[in-house]
């Protein structure tokens, strides 16, 4: 840790620990209604979200409607289709390796379940797969499993962006967010140790303000040297041309910046310290802005 100059945190599922299943059910029920609005059968409402059936580390085979649990040798230990377990013989027939070829699970129709947000996707996709296999719904007969997965993913994602989830959380944060008494002392200790502490979240300012006010209090921004909301990760880490906007904390007003050219003194800028003195809350940007404002040269610092 002695070589680390800056420490960053995400907000959702990091500083803000969401309560399951209450939080997940908001996304699940909201996505169900969106799918029904797209033409999916109303019987989709008969399925309930059950977090105990899903976990991170699974792989979704969107082409076949299957869910896989593999070991470190990429051997499929368990597989299920929709909510039903696939027999051992059939599982080996589909996913077993040959004498010189092992499955890579890197093709586009395989999706890694590596975030808690995706557990809702699993449950909802399994429900649509089950309904399609019943062959009782003409709308689903015209859909492939891959198309259904894309619909599920788009519906859940829209719930996170259009207010279906976050408006409800903002109305009653105690119902959906757990507090951690160790969080504030931890952040303060990092600053006392001379580390720069930053918040980098995909959530927008209004929601971030509500959640952090609940977790920490109205002075929560004092715990951070830099705050970036609406970061659009993972694109934030890839696209160097994303614009950086400064946020006026009191009003939420956005002002465009000249990016790294305004920050770096060697590029004719005013320097990170002077730049942040004008306001340390931003929206968007990319990793180059982050490094420039923190005064670090690489992610390793």
PLM feature spans:
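HAD-like aspartate-dependent phosphatase fold
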Residues: 1-301
């Amino acid at each position: 840790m002695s070589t680390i100059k800056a420490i960053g945190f995400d907000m959702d599922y990091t500083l803000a620990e969401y309560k399951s299943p209450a939080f997940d059910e908001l996304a699940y029920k909201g996505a169900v209604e969106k799918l029904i609005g797209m033409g999916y059968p109303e019987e989709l409402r008969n399925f309930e979200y059950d977090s105990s059936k899903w976990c991170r580390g699974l792989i979704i085979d969107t082409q076949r409607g299957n869910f896989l649990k593999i070991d470190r040798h990429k051997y499929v230990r368990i597989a299920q289709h929709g909510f039903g377990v696939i027999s051992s013989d059939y599982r080996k027939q589909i996913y077993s390796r040959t004498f010189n070829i092992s499955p890579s699970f890197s093709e586009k129709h395989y999706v890694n379940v590596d975030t808690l947000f995706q557990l809702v996707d699993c449950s909802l996709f399994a429900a649509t797969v089950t309904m399609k296999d019943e062959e009782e719904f003409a709308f689903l007969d015209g859909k492939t499993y891959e198309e259904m997965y894309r619909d599920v993913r788009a519906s859940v994602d829209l719930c996170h962006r259009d207010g279906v989830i976050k408006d409800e959380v903002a109305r009653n944060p105690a119902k959906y967010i757990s507090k951690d008494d160790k969080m504030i002392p931890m952040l303060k200790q990092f600053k006392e140790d001379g580390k720069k502490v930053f918040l980098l979240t995909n959530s927008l300012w209004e929601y971030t303000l509500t959640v952090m006010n609940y977790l920490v209090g109205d002075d929560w921004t004092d715990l951070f040297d830099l705050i970036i909301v609406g970061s659009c990760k993972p694109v934030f880490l890839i696209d160097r041309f994303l614009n950086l906007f400064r946020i006026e904390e009191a009003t939420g007003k956005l002002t465009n910046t000249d990016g790294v050219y305004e920050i770096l003194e060697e590029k004719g800028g005013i320097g990170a310290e002077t730049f942040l003195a004008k306001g340390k809350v931003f929206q968007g940007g990319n990793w180059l802005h982050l490094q420039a404002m923190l005064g670090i040269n690489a992610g390793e610092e």
